[in-house]
């Protein structure tokens, strides 16, 4: 068996893998892609609802909205429904209202505000009133109004 000199340089495959990893890390964190495919569920201690298309439901006491890894909690909520009785929008208030979601990388986003207005169609949550959001690896933001895109994890 012949011995050959070994190079200290990483192989081309290793260099490409490192480059690819670096490019992936430069991309913005994306919210769970499969969350949007999950049904939106809301629970509470009590509720009052209309029996008409394009109606609404008022929830009271320990309100919890979930859709995949997305979770919104609060004391009170109003859910707006379309003609098929699917949830299109939920406004949650609490002391404070809380939102959290895990992105595809496993990073947790958490936020609190006096009110969270979640648009299930546009996948946007607007936190209003002493709003605070923390995203692992991306820092935190505070303000009177913060907008969080649950599809892209972008905060404005």
Regions found by a protein language model. Give the residues of each.
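Bacterial N-terminal signal peptides that target proteins for export
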Residues: 2-17
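Short, linear, compositionally biased motifs with a strong N-terminal bias
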Residues: 20-23
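N-terminal signal peptide c-region/cleavage motif recognized by signal peptidases
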Residues: 26-28
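N-terminal amphipathic/hydrophobic interface segments
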Residues: 30-156
